[in-house]
């Protein structure tokens, strides 16, 4: 089997990001981003997606976290696009529901080649531990635009904002895991009647 790994660097005047991923990993993760709550959420992707993630970022967090969060999403999306390759043999679609106490979220993903994000999370607070939760929209938009996926994210219920967000990221990891899994019955075929994605 071809190794589904990628290492990507993205440098701008605002951030310098390095991202290495292994889609067939065991959930190992290492982060040096400087935004602890984002690192905590990225760890959920690795653990629940069984994806090895190594991400470093030096960003202008002295201004705020916006550029760092968005650019990590962009670079992670670029790494996914590179690692997934031509998409032959993958399940393509993934979905997951994840609860955490009172919170419940659903994530559905399609490695369609068509970027699109529908994200509906009615946060009950504007921040968690000083982190502006609106920035997760920027993270997922950056990921979607560069991984070329269609992504639907819905927090169905919850009143603890930390729980709302954590269920989203856990469900995202689980949905990714389903979508990128190789289907033995596809035997290297493209998962589309068009013959390409």
Swiss-Prot record:
Q: Which residues cross the membrane?
A: none
Q: Does this UniProt record's set of keywords contain Amino-acid biosynthesis?
A: yes
Gene3D superfamilies found in the cross-reference section: Imidazole glycerol phosphate dehydratase, domain 1
Location relative to the cell:
Cytoplasm
Among the GO biological process terms of this entry, one is: L-histidine biosynthetic process
The protein's annotated catalytic reaction(s) are: D-erythro-1-(imidazol-4-yl)glycerol 3-phosphate = 3-(imidazol-4-yl)-2-oxopropyl phosphate + H2O
Q: What Enzyme Commission number(s) appear in the record?
A: 4.2.1.19
Chief localisation class: cytoplasm
Keyword field: Amino-acid biosynthesis, Cytoplasm, Histidine biosynthesis, Lyase
Q: Which domain of life is it from?
A: Bacteria
Q: Locate the coiled-coil region(s) and give their ranges.
A: none
Q: Which GO terms describe its cellular component?
A: cytoplasm
Q: Which GO terms describe its molecular function?
A: imidazoleglycerol-phosphate dehydratase activity
Please name the top-level EC class of this enzyme. Answer: lyase
Question: In which pathway is this protein known to take part?
Answer: Amino-acid biosynthesis; L-histidine biosynthesis; L-histidine from 5-phospho-alpha-D-ribose 1-diphosphate: step 6/9
Q: Which NCBIfam families match?
A: PRK00951.1-1 (NF002106), PRK00951.2-1 (NF002111), PRK00951.2-4 (NF002114)
State the family named in the UniProt similarity comment for this chain: Belongs to the imidazoleglycerol-phosphate dehydratase family.
State the protein's name.
Answer: Imidazoleglycerol-phosphate dehydratase
């Amino acid at each position: 089997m071809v190794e589904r790994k990628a290492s990507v660097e993205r440098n701008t005047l605002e951030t310098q990001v390095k991202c290495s991923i292994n889609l067939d990993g065991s959930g190992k993760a290492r982060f040096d981003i400087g935004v602890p709550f984002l690192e905590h959420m990225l760890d959920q992707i690795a653990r629940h997606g069984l994806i090895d993630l190594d991400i470093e970022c030096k960003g202008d967090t002295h201004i705020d976290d916006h550029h760092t969060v968005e650019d990590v999403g962009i670079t992670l999306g670029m790494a996914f696009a590179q690692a997934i390759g031509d998409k032959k043999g993958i399940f393509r679609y993934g979905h997951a529901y994840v609860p955490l106490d009172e919170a419940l979220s659903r994530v559905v993903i399609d490695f369609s080649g068509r970027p699109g994000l529908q994200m509906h999370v009615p946060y009950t607070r504007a921040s968690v531990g000083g982190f502006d939760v609106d920035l997760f929209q920027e993270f997922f938009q950056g990921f979607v635009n560069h991984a070329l996926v269609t992504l639907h994210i819905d927090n169905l219920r919850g009143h603890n904002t930390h729980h709302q967000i954590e269920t989203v990221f856990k469900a995202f990891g689980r949905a990714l895991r389903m979508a990128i899994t190789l289907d033995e019955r596809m035997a290297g075929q493209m998962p589309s009647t068009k013959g390409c994605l």
